[in-house]
From Swiss-Prot:
It holds the Pfam family Glyco_hydro_62. It comes from Aspergillus terreus (strain NIH 2624 / FGSC A1156). It is found in: Secreted. GO terms for biological process: L-arabinose metabolic process; xylan catabolic process. Alpha-L-arabinofuranosidase involved in the hydrolysis of xylan, a major structural heterogeneous polysaccharide found in plant biomass representing the second most abundant polysaccharide in the biosphere, after cellulose. Releases L-arabinose from arabinoxylan. InterPro entries: GH62_arabinosidase, Glyco_hydro_beta-prop_sf. It is an enzyme of class 3 (hydrolase). Keywords: Carbohydrate metabolism, Glycoprotein, Glycosidase, Hydrolase, Polysaccharide degradation, Secreted, Signal, Xylan degradation. It comes from the Eukaryota. The keyword Isomerase does not apply. Glycans are attached at residue 307. One of its GO terms (cellular component) is extracellular region. This is Probable alpha-L-arabinofuranosidase axhA.
Length: 326
């Protein structure tokens, strides 16, 4: 376990890989075009997929957690050993978690100097664990309740949470595979803690248009927040994007069609996958603000061979990274 660093050192160290964009301020583009890596890693023996990625940069290295599946469709979770460059992901060790944290979200909660790993399918609808060393896959605390509510008209129940904070509040966003995105909130002074049982619908559309894998970010240098949501299209999974001026505000569609998505087959530049699915934008720093640099957007995502088919929980998902063209 590494010695604990100060809050300032930890937060600043997370910006190392993106420091080149610090001097400039960019707006989000009106249309997106990306380049893509090939698949960056193969699951180790016993796993059929690596999926549902969450990523922070700390001490100049990527820390990536993910869900796993096996040949029977059973879920688990894992973490890669920290690595500096995406090209190193294939050789990074893959470390199974002894207690699963499926569809994870990792971040550093600066006000309490603690790392948070939020996830689903734990003791409550959403749960969280804490740690002083996020690189240790099995160094997390016992599970604590993050959200205990339920939703109607959903075959999955609450799914695919993300957590983000501003100066005064923490917010929980999640999906339900039912065309709705939900939000709950609490005072930042009470976090980490339980968001309770109540939530509100902040977006509503068809199931295919608002399916799952919601993520929310602060846009660096702008009074703006960015939400991305996975959708089901005719050519595969893709992300739609929305913006808002505050985390408690209304969301407006930004890049919302399959032919002009935030990220999808139409604009990903990927040749190995038609699907751009559950992932995480690379953040400026690892803290609860989830800040991204619009001058240097990268998306860690899950993709799969276009010829693969069968039960969703047995599909061979792999990690890839999109880099925004500038």
């Amino acid at each position: 376990m590494r010695p604990r660093q100060s809050k300032v050192t930890q937060v600043l160290s997370g910006a190392v890989l993106l420091a080149s964009g610090a001097a400039a301020s960019c707006s989000l583009p009106s249309t997106y075009s990306w380049t893509s890596t090939e698949a960056l890693a193969e699951p180790k023996s016993g796993w059929t997929a690596l999926k549902d990625f969450t990523n922070v940069v700390s001490n100049g290295q990527h820390i990536v957690y993910a869900s796993t599946t096996d040949s029977s469709g059973n879920y688990g979770s894992m973490a890669f050993s920290p690595f500096a460059d995406w090209s190193d992901m294939a050789s990074a060790s893959q470390n199974a978690m002894s207690a699963s944290a499926v569809a994870p979200t990792i971040f550093y909660f600066a006000p309490k100097d603690v790392w948070i790993l939020a996830y689903q399918w734990g003791p409550t609808a959403f749960s969280y664990k804490t740690s002083s060393d996020p690189s240790d896959a099995n160094g997390w605390s016992e599970a604590q309740p993050l959200f205990s509510g339920s939703i109607s008209d959903s075959s999955t129940g609450v799914i695919d949470q993300t957590v983000i904070g501003d100066d005064t509040n923490m917010y929980l966003f999640f999906a339900g595979d039912n065309g709705r995105i939900y939000r709950a909130s609490m005072s930042i002074d009470n976090f980490p803690g339980d968001f309770g049982t109540q939530s509100e619908v902040v977006l509503e559309d068809t199931t295919n248009n608002l399916f799952e894998a919601v993520q929310v970010y602060k846009v660096d240098g702008q009074d703006q927040y960015l939400m991305i949501v996975e959708a089901i299209g005719s050519a595969g999974r893709y992300f739609r994007s929305f913006t808002a001026s505050s985390l408690d505000g209304e969301w407006t569609v930004q890049a919302g069609t399959e032919d002009q998505p935030f990220a999808g087959k139409a604009n990903s530049g990927a040749s190995w996958t038609n699907d751009i699915s559950h992932g995480d934008l690379v953040r400026n720093n690892p803290d609860q603000t989830f800040t991204v640099d619009p001058c240097n957007l990268q998306l860690l995502y899950q993709g799969k061979d276009p010829n693969s088919s069968g039960d969703y929980n047995q599909l061979a998902w792999r990690p890839g990274v999109l880099t925004l063209k500038v």
